[in-house]
Structure formats: C-alpha cells, structure tokens
C-alpha cells in the first residue's frame, strides 16, 4: 500500500557500508522501520543521511507491505526544518535522549494520532524556546499518557507515590517514593511547557525527578533499557 504521511525519526542504524535501517513513528501507521539503500551516497539526494537525525520530522512517501518486514521510502523531505535543535548542544543532547526513550518505549505498529501530534508540538516548542531546563522531564511524564501509565492524580493529597500502581497513597510501600520525592513529583505534574519557567526546579531536584521517571518507565514497560545518553544529559543539567 502506497502512503504519504508525516514521520518522526526515532533511530537510524548503519547497515553495511552505505545503507541505513531507520525507525520512524508515523502519523498514518505508528511505528515503522525502513531500509534506506545508499543513504551515504551523494547521488541519492532525496534520501540524504542528514534527514535521519534523531526526532527530525519528515514528509514521506512509502510503500507499506505491512508484513513485519522492512519498508521502503519512495520520497523523503523535511516537513518543517528545525532552526535550533540540531545546532544547539543542549537541545541536541535532549533530543538524542528522548529518541532513545521512545526507541525503548514505542513497540506497536498502530496509529496513534494524538501521540504523534503531541510529540510534533513538543518538538516545535523546544525548537522555538530557550528556557528548556525542565523540557525533558515534562515530556517524559506527559508521554506516559499515551503509553498507558500516566499517574492517577485523584488523591494527590496523600504523602506517598506508589510506583508500581501509579497512584498516591497514605501508606509507604517498598516501591513508594519518599515524602520529599513525592512532593517533587507533584510539582512536576503541575508543570506544563508554557509555565515551566515560573515553576523553577533546582538542578538537584531535576536529577532526582529524572531518576524517578526512568525508574517509573522501568516499572511499567517490559524490557525498558536505561538510555546510553542519560549520563550526558545529567552532565548538561548538573
């Protein structure tokens, strides 16, 4: 089936000398993997290696056989060029980290237009703003809405957040956050991209929240792996 859709690049792995295997989250079909022959060749101008940087938003034409095999692009172009993401060291570190998180989190080949729209909007926000220290934390938490384990916030007056059940509790269990960690987590829940500058988190608080979120993903996603770029991200925001 021939399709034309938007796609967000999740990962690109070199195959042999000149080719790539590119994983994309598409608007039309969810997660798809593509084989790009001669991606490193200057002759193939419509499928340049530069198009497949982490979280680049593409317009693609492709043939989807939907047989669980690698698909093929017919045409690829940048949907909306980023102005700063791939040129700013901090922003590029963030997108590498987020792309790793998504690589280990999205597994289903099914359409999720709401999730795609959220990611696209968030990336444009990142590209157009400079006060971004809380961006990765907000995105990780908001992403859990689309992955199916957003915290139950009906009882936030309780002092402990229980990680395995994803809810606030009056009792402390083995998998609960401490009271201090829970208060920080509540603070994060109240943050949105547009109000993140008025609700300042200190660098140590960000480090605590990042650890909480990585652990939370590990509790709720089978086979979730800690991103290799995590330590670099910690250094950036230390």
Swiss-Prot record:
Disulfide cysteine pairs (residue numbers): none
Transmembrane segments: none
Classification via Pfam families: RecO_C, RecO_N
Gene Ontology CC terms, in alphabetical order: bacterial nucleoid
GO biological process: DNA recombination; double-strand break repair
InterPro entries: ARFGAP/RecO (IPR037278), DNA_rep/recomb_RecO_N (IPR022572), NA-bd_OB-fold (IPR012340), RecO (IPR003717), RecO_C (IPR042242)
Record flagged with keyword Phosphoprotein: no
Alphabetically ordered keywords of this record: DNA damage, DNA recombination, DNA repair
NCBIfam families in the cross-refs: reco
Family per record: Belongs to the RecO family.
Protein name: DNA repair protein RecO
Organism in which the protein naturally occurs: Flavobacterium psychrophilum (strain ATCC 49511 / DSM 21280 / CIP 103535 / JIP02/86)
Lineage start: Bacteria, Pseudomonadati, Bacteroidota, Flavobacteriia, Flavobacteriales
Name of the gene: recO
């Amino acid at each position: 089936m021939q399709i034309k859709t938007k796609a967000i690049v999740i990962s690109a792995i070199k195959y042999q000398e000149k080719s790539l295997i590119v994983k994309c989250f598409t608007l039309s079909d969810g997660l798809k993997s593509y084989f790009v022959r001669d991606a490193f060749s200057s002759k193939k101008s419509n499928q340049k290696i530069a198009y497949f940087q982490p979280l680049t938003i593409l317009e693609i034409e492709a043939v989807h056989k939907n047989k669980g095999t690698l698909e093929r692009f017919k045409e690829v172009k940048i949907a909306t060029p980023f102005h700063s993401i791939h040129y700013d060291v901090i922003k590029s570190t963030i997108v590498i980290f987020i792309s790793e998180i998504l690589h280990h989190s999205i597994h289903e080949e099914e359409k999720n237009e709401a999730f795609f729209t959220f990611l696209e909007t968030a990336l444009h926000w990142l590209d157009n703003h400079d006060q971004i220290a809380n961006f990765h934390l907000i995105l990780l938490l908001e992403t859990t809405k689309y992955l199916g384990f957003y915290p139950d916030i009906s009882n936030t007056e309780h002092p402990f957040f229980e990680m395995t059940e994803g809810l606030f509790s009056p009792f402390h269990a083995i998998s609960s956050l401490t009271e201090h960690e829970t208060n920080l987590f509540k603070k994060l829940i109240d943050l949105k991209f547009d109000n993140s500058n008025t609700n300042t988190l200190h660098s140590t608080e960000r480090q605590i929240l990042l650890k909480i979120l990585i652990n939370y993903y590990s509790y709720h996603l089978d086979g979730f792996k800690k991103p290799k770029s995590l330590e670099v991200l910690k250094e950036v925001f230390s």
